[in-house]
Swiss-Prot record:
Its EC number is 2.1.1.199. Belongs to the methyltransferase superfamily. RsmH family. One of its GO terms (molecular function) is rRNA (cytosine-N4-)-methyltransferase activity. It comes from the Bacteria. InterPro entries: RsmH, SAM-dep_MeTrfase_MraW_recog, SAM-dependent_MTases_sf. The keyword Lyase does not apply. Keywords: Cytoplasm, Methyltransferase, rRNA processing, S-adenosyl-L-methionine, Transferase. The gene is rsmH. GO terms for biological process: rRNA base methylation. Its main location: cytoplasm. It is found in: Cytoplasm. It comes from Listeria monocytogenes serotype 4b (strain F2365). Specifically methylates the N4 position of cytidine in position 1402 (C1402) of 16S rRNA. It catalyses: cytidine(1402) in 16S rRNA + S-adenosyl-L-methionine = N(4)-methylcytidine(1402) in 16S rRNA + S-adenosyl-L-homocysteine + H(+). This is Ribosomal RNA small subunit methyltransferase H.
Length: 312
């Protein structure tokens, strides 16, 4: 069964200021914790559209949310296609959207999905099992320069060159097939003193490959830009991020959306059309409480940012 500790559960949904008869979107269904809490706040007129590109997540959520089946529509799609999918169903605007950008724990924990550096499995890492690009293709077929780029940009890995060089050396002998082989390569490439600190030595490289396989950052940027255009006045978007790359994208997009155009100084009154359409609902990101961190260590790096469309 899908086990998943929902991070910042109450904060994320409560910050949406849910209207009982509103239309809402869970862009990242996952273990359905946020969806369940949100559905509990809706009356018979309210509705939730829940997105996930992982069929397993949807199948499990249908069981978990069976009591709410008349109030929820499940959509198997990447959240970058959210606007188009909603438009196809006659939905042009919504009251709130939530994102939990963490990889759901079951995907990390299921050995055969190939996400984990703790378990030996085939190199896969696809969120959508129907897509062609896998971690095995990235590791064996991408150029030395491209590997350096993704390890550095997406993993913020200091030893990107050394790891890419060791991958190149090994794959000339035979294809790299498993997560265990990749971990061995990373351990060989990283100097011993560096291996002993900062958690598992494979953490950053695995993150980088996962982001590349699923085009995670491109999808986040595309989806958030479209999400802003879907909001009704007074509507809100809640976004939980887990690493600096996603948080930077979210922060920059939100800052851009809340800025008005450059106007000459000293205008007595700013015309409505020049006022920004959005405002930040939280000045600083909301982070998990000490109590939550004690119960769920995976929440440690979580940050919640919220934006609201201004009623004019």
């Amino acid at each position: 069964m899908f086990k998943h500790e929902t991070v910042l559960l109450h904060e994320t949904v409560d910050m949406l200021e849910v209207k009982p008869d509103g239309i809402y979107v869970d862009a990242t269904l996952g273990g359905a914790g946020h969806s369940e809490y949100l559905l509990n706040k809706l009356n018979e007129k309210g509705h939730l559209f829940a997105f996930d590109q992982d069929q397993t997540a949807i199948d499990n959520a249908k069981i978990k949310l069976a009591d709410y089946s008349d109030k929820v529509t499940f959509i198997k799609a990447n959240f970058r296609d959210m606007k188009e999918a909603l438009n196809e169903r006659g939905i042009e605007a919504v009251d709130g959207i939530l994102y939990d950008l963490g990889v759901s724990s079951p995907q990390l924990d299921e050995r055969e999905r190939g996400f984990s550096y703790h378990q030996d499995a085939a190199l896969d890492m696809r969120m959508d099992q129907e897509q062609e690009l896998t971690a095995k293709i990235v590791v064996n077929e991408w150029s030395y320069q491209d590997l350096i780029r993704i390890f550095f940009q997406y993993g913020e890995e200091k030893f990107s060159k050394q790891i890419a060089r060791e991958i190149e050396r090994r794959r000339e002998v035979k294809p790299i097939e498993t997560t265990g082989e990749l971990v061995d390569i990373i351990k060989t490439a990283i100097p011993a003193p560096a291996r002993r600190k900062g958690g598992h030595p494979g953490k950053r490289t695995f993150q980088a490959i996962r982001i590349a396989v699923n085009d995670e950052l491109g999808a986040v940027e595309d989806s958030l830009e479209k999400a802003l255009t879907l909001l009704k006045p007074g509507g809100r978007i809640s976004v939980i991020t887990f690493h600096s790359l996603e948080d930077r994208i979210t922060k920059q997009l939100f800052q851009e959306a809340t800025k008005g155009p450059d106007l000459p100084p000293g205008l007595p009154v700013i015309p409505d059309e020049y006022k920004p359409d959005f405002k930040l609902a939280t000045r600083k990101p909301i982070v998990p409480s000490e109590e939550e961190l004690e119960q769920n260590n995976r929440a440690r790096s979580a940050k919640l940012r919220v934006i609201e469309k201004i009623i004019k």
